[in-house]
Amino acid sequence: PVLVTLWTRPITSKTPLAIDNPEKLGTMAVAELLRHEGISVSKADSVSKAVEASRNGATIAVVNADRLSLAERKALAQAGGDVVIVGVRGGSDTLKGLTDMTSKGAASPGSTILEPQCGDADAQAARSLAGSHASVSLQGDDDAVGCFPVGEDRYAYATDTLPSGAALRVLADPGPATNAHLA
Protein backbone atom coordinates (compact mmCIF):
# COMPACT_ATOMS: atom_id res chain seq x y z
CA PRO A 1 0.00 0.00 0.00
CA VAL A 2 1.09 3.54 -0.76
CA LEU A 3 -0.19 6.75 0.81
CA VAL A 4 0.31 9.89 -1.18
CA THR A 5 -0.35 13.24 0.42
CA LEU A 6 -0.34 16.55 -1.30
CA TRP A 7 0.14 19.71 0.69
CA THR A 8 -1.59 22.61 -0.90
CA ARG A 9 -2.07 26.16 0.12
CA PRO A 10 -5.55 27.53 0.31
CA ILE A 11 -6.25 29.94 -2.50
CA THR A 12 -6.66 33.41 -1.09
CA SER A 13 -7.09 36.83 -2.57
CA LYS A 14 -5.52 40.19 -1.89
CA THR A 15 -8.51 42.01 -3.38
CA PRO A 16 -10.00 44.47 -0.87
CA LEU A 17 -13.38 43.33 0.50
CA ALA A 18 -13.06 39.87 -1.07
CA ILE A 19 -14.55 36.98 0.93
CA ASP A 20 -11.37 34.97 0.37
CA ASN A 21 -9.00 37.75 1.50
CA PRO A 22 -7.58 37.06 4.99
CA GLU A 23 -5.77 40.43 5.16
CA LYS A 24 -7.01 43.52 7.04
CA LEU A 25 -9.09 44.86 4.14
CA GLY A 26 -10.63 41.48 3.28
CA THR A 27 -13.99 40.13 4.43
CA MET A 28 -13.03 36.51 5.05
CA ALA A 29 -13.96 36.83 8.74
CA VAL A 30 -17.53 37.93 8.04
CA ALA A 31 -17.87 35.18 5.41
CA GLU A 32 -16.76 32.59 7.97
CA LEU A 33 -19.13 34.00 10.60
CA LEU A 34 -22.02 33.69 8.14
CA ARG A 35 -21.01 30.13 7.24
CA HIS A 36 -20.89 29.29 10.95
CA GLU A 37 -24.51 30.47 11.14
CA GLY A 38 -25.45 28.08 8.32
CA ILE A 39 -25.49 30.66 5.54
CA SER A 40 -23.91 29.65 2.26
CA VAL A 41 -21.41 32.28 1.10
CA SER A 42 -19.92 32.34 -2.39
CA LYS A 43 -18.81 34.87 -4.94
CA ALA A 44 -20.36 35.35 -8.34
CA ASP A 45 -17.96 35.93 -11.21
CA SER A 46 -20.50 37.90 -13.24
CA VAL A 47 -23.49 40.14 -12.71
CA SER A 48 -25.68 37.71 -14.68
CA LYS A 49 -24.83 34.93 -12.19
CA ALA A 50 -25.61 37.25 -9.28
CA VAL A 51 -28.95 38.19 -10.86
CA GLU A 52 -29.80 34.51 -11.38
CA ALA A 53 -28.91 33.72 -7.75
CA SER A 54 -31.08 36.65 -6.65
CA ARG A 55 -33.99 35.29 -8.69
CA ASN A 56 -33.56 32.07 -6.72
CA GLY A 57 -33.84 33.93 -3.40
CA ALA A 58 -30.19 34.64 -2.59
CA THR A 59 -29.18 37.86 -0.89
CA ILE A 60 -26.58 39.61 -3.02
CA ALA A 61 -23.85 41.67 -1.36
CA VAL A 62 -22.26 44.12 -3.78
CA VAL A 63 -18.92 45.83 -3.30
CA ASN A 64 -17.78 48.46 -5.79
CA ALA A 65 -21.35 48.97 -6.97
CA ASP A 66 -20.17 52.11 -8.74
CA ARG A 67 -18.40 49.82 -11.24
CA LEU A 68 -21.71 48.29 -12.32
CA SER A 69 -23.58 49.85 -15.21
CA LEU A 70 -26.96 51.44 -14.60
CA ALA A 71 -28.56 48.50 -16.45
CA GLU A 72 -26.77 46.01 -14.16
CA ARG A 73 -27.89 47.83 -11.01
CA LYS A 74 -31.47 47.92 -12.34
CA ALA A 75 -31.32 44.18 -13.10
CA LEU A 76 -30.27 43.48 -9.49
CA ALA A 77 -33.06 45.74 -8.22
CA GLN A 78 -35.65 43.79 -10.23
CA ALA A 79 -34.31 40.27 -9.63
CA GLY A 80 -36.27 39.54 -6.45
CA GLY A 81 -33.63 38.90 -3.79
CA ASP A 82 -32.39 41.26 -1.11
CA VAL A 83 -29.38 43.41 -2.03
CA VAL A 84 -26.71 44.69 0.36
CA ILE A 85 -24.43 47.47 -0.87
CA VAL A 86 -21.14 47.46 1.02
CA GLY A 87 -19.40 50.81 0.63
CA VAL A 88 -20.42 53.87 -1.36
CA ARG A 89 -18.29 56.64 -2.80
CA GLY A 90 -19.50 60.11 -1.94
CA GLY A 91 -21.00 61.93 -4.89
CA SER A 92 -20.99 58.84 -7.13
CA ASP A 93 -23.92 57.17 -8.86
CA THR A 94 -23.34 54.01 -6.80
CA LEU A 95 -27.01 53.72 -5.80
CA LYS A 96 -28.67 54.93 -9.00
CA GLY A 97 -30.96 52.25 -10.41
CA LEU A 98 -31.42 50.69 -6.97
CA THR A 99 -32.87 53.55 -4.91
CA ASP A 100 -33.39 57.30 -4.83
CA MET A 101 -30.96 57.56 -1.91
CA THR A 102 -27.66 59.20 -2.81
CA SER A 103 -24.11 58.58 -1.61
CA LYS A 104 -22.41 61.40 0.26
CA GLY A 105 -18.94 62.07 1.54
CA ALA A 106 -20.08 63.20 5.00
CA ALA A 107 -18.39 61.18 7.69
CA SER A 108 -17.82 60.94 11.41
CA PRO A 109 -14.55 60.21 13.22
CA GLY A 110 -13.78 56.61 14.15
CA SER A 111 -13.80 57.67 17.79
CA THR A 112 -17.49 58.60 17.49
CA ILE A 113 -19.91 55.87 18.57
CA LEU A 114 -22.99 55.98 16.35
CA GLU A 115 -26.33 54.72 17.70
CA PRO A 116 -28.95 53.17 15.37
CA GLN A 117 -31.81 55.64 16.05
CA CYS A 118 -34.19 53.57 13.90
CA GLY A 119 -36.33 50.47 14.26
CA ASP A 120 -34.49 48.32 11.69
CA ALA A 121 -33.86 44.88 13.23
CA ASP A 122 -30.33 44.59 11.80
CA ALA A 123 -29.35 48.04 13.04
CA GLN A 124 -30.78 47.28 16.47
CA ALA A 125 -28.84 44.00 16.59
CA ALA A 126 -25.61 45.85 15.74
CA ARG A 127 -26.31 48.34 18.57
CA SER A 128 -23.56 50.76 17.49
CA LEU A 129 -21.01 51.63 14.82
CA ALA A 130 -17.62 53.20 15.50
CA GLY A 131 -17.74 56.17 13.15
CA SER A 132 -18.23 56.06 9.40
CA HIS A 133 -16.08 57.24 6.49
CA ALA A 134 -19.09 57.59 4.18
CA SER A 135 -22.82 58.23 4.32
CA VAL A 136 -26.04 58.27 2.35
CA SER A 137 -28.75 60.90 2.07
CA LEU A 138 -32.44 60.01 2.05
CA GLN A 139 -33.46 63.28 0.40
CA GLY A 140 -35.89 62.47 -2.41
CA ASP A 141 -36.58 58.94 -1.16
CA ASP A 142 -39.65 59.10 1.06
CA ASP A 143 -39.78 55.42 2.08
CA ALA A 144 -36.08 54.85 2.88
CA VAL A 145 -35.06 54.50 6.53
CA GLY A 146 -31.79 55.96 7.78
CA CYS A 147 -29.90 54.54 10.76
CA PHE A 148 -26.71 55.58 12.53
CA PRO A 149 -26.89 59.31 11.69
CA VAL A 150 -23.56 61.05 11.03
CA GLY A 151 -25.13 64.45 10.40
CA GLU A 152 -28.29 66.10 9.14
CA ASP A 153 -29.81 63.73 6.55
CA ARG A 154 -26.59 61.68 6.47
CA TYR A 155 -26.60 58.05 7.61
CA ALA A 156 -23.96 55.33 7.92
CA TYR A 157 -26.59 52.64 7.21
CA ALA A 158 -29.94 52.83 5.47
CA THR A 159 -32.63 50.55 4.11
CA ASP A 160 -35.13 50.86 1.30
CA THR A 161 -37.49 48.67 -0.68
CA LEU A 162 -36.29 47.61 -4.12
CA PRO A 163 -38.67 47.77 -7.11
CA SER A 164 -39.01 43.96 -6.80
CA GLY A 165 -40.29 44.37 -3.23
CA ALA A 166 -37.11 42.90 -1.72
CA ALA A 167 -34.98 44.79 0.78
CA LEU A 168 -32.04 47.03 -0.03
CA ARG A 169 -29.50 47.60 2.74
CA VAL A 170 -26.68 50.10 2.36
CA LEU A 171 -23.63 50.08 4.62
CA ALA A 172 -22.00 53.31 3.45
CA ASP A 173 -18.54 52.60 4.88
CA PRO A 174 -17.28 49.06 4.21
CA GLY A 175 -14.97 49.23 7.25
CA PRO A 176 -17.26 47.40 9.71
CA ALA A 177 -17.34 44.35 7.40
CA THR A 178 -13.55 44.04 7.12
CA ASN A 179 -11.29 41.59 8.90
CA ALA A 180 -9.50 44.48 10.63
CA HIS A 181 -12.74 45.58 12.26
CA LEU A 182 -13.83 42.08 13.26
CA ALA A 183 -10.49 40.95 14.66
Where are these regions (language model features)?
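Short, surface-exposed patches at the edges or C-terminal ends of soluble domains, predominantly
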Residues: 1-183
